[in-house]
């Protein structure tokens, strides 16, 4: 680790590792995402830190399950982060 670090222009990797309140510009860790069901290929919008089990609207398959932080996607589900 170098002794001289540029505090005004930190690298993107350093900023991602910091706590959300300690970043140069505060930003949340959570986001919304489009999750595609592996069975019926319908797209459902899911919160990244969902606290309840999310089911598919079409076939009632479990898309994600809550953990302590981020929700765990079911195997076979693909997702895309939504742009704001």
Curated annotation (Swiss-Prot):
Q: Which cofactor does it need?
A: Zn(2+)
Q: Does the keyword NADP apply?
A: no
Cited SUPFAM superfamilies: Zn-binding ribosomal proteins
Task: Write out the similarity annotation.
Answer: Belongs to the eukaryotic ribosomal protein eS27 family.
Identify the taxonomic lineage of the organism of origin.
Eukaryota, Metazoa, Chordata, Craniata, Vertebrata
Chain positions covered by the region annotation Disordered? 1-23
Q: What are its GO biological-process terms?
A: ribosomal small subunit assembly; translation
Query: Keyword set for this entry?
Result: Metal-binding, Ribonucleoprotein, Ribosomal protein, Zinc, Zinc-finger
Entry-linked PANTHER family = 40S RIBOSOMAL PROTEIN S27 (PTHR11594)
| Protein name, UniProt field | Small ribosomal subunit protein eS27-like
Q: Does the keyword Acetylation apply?
A: no
Tell me a Gene Ontology molecular-function term this record carries.
structural constituent of ribosome
Quote the biased-composition stretches of kind Basic and acidic residues, using this chain's numbering: 1-16
Any matching Pfam family: Ribosomal_S27e
Zinc finger (C4-type) residue numbers:
38-60
Cofactor: binding details: Binds 1 zinc ion per subunit.
